[in-house]
A protein has these predicted regions:
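Conserved C-terminal structural/oligomerization subdomain of aldehyde/semialdehyde dehydrogenase
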Residues: 1-3, 51, 55-175
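ALDH superfamily catalytic-core signature
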Residues: 1-68, 131
Length: 175
């Protein structure tokens, strides 16, 4: 399934477009290089479509397996199509892995168990938690607060208006 991910220019029906700049492309390449030098295996990767211009800032989507929790691929925000997979056996391990980074913008949980869905959502240190999906249904109109070094999202939705409001109390005694 991961191999079917396609990267290319906008206007085509693709899963991923180009990175924002040459600098970001180089940053993503550095993540790939660091992972490979650490012996971390890319177990699957997508493809760049033939229609993609050679000068574009494209990066093949890659799925890395058995990424150590301390490796930068598991600790830093890549902002590119790289996915780090780290196995776990228990909920406690999963929570420790997810909460063991300095970031906490978004988390995802896949389970059919309704009690586990809520239990995990409450334990994960993230401003937004998706259950059985990722990135769908959040919408730009829903506020959320990233945790740690992730903070985008607080300015969305009705709740954000309070940050731009100045309250005033007027007390009048009559008579």
């Amino acid at each position: 399934m991961f191999e079917s991910l396609r990267v290319g220019p906008s206007g085509l029906d693709l899963e991923c477009g180009p990175l924002i700049s040459r600098k970001q492309q180089q940053r993503v390449w550095d993540f790939v290089s660091d992972a490979q030098h650490a012996g971390i295996v890319a177990m699957a990767q997508g493809q760049i479509v033939a229609e993609a211009p050679e000068a574009g800032y494209y990066q093949v989507p890659m799925l890395f397996r058995d990424v150590p929790p301390t490796h930068r691929l598991a600790q830093e925000e890549v902002f590119g199509p790289l996915l780090a997979a780290t196995p776990f056996d228990t909920e406690a391990e999963a929570v420790a892995l997810a909460n063991g980074t300095p970031y906490g913008l978004v988390a995802g949980v896949w389970t059919r168990d309704g009690a586990r869905q809520l239990r995990m959502a409450h334990k994960l240190r993230a401003g937004q938690v998706f259950i059985n999906n990722y990135g769908a249904g959040g919408g730009v109109e829903l506020p959320f607060g990233g945790t740690g070094q992730s903070g985008y999202g607080r300015e969305k939705g009705f709740e954000a208006l309070y940050g731009f409001t100045t309250l005033k109390t007027i007390a009048i005694q009559h008579g």
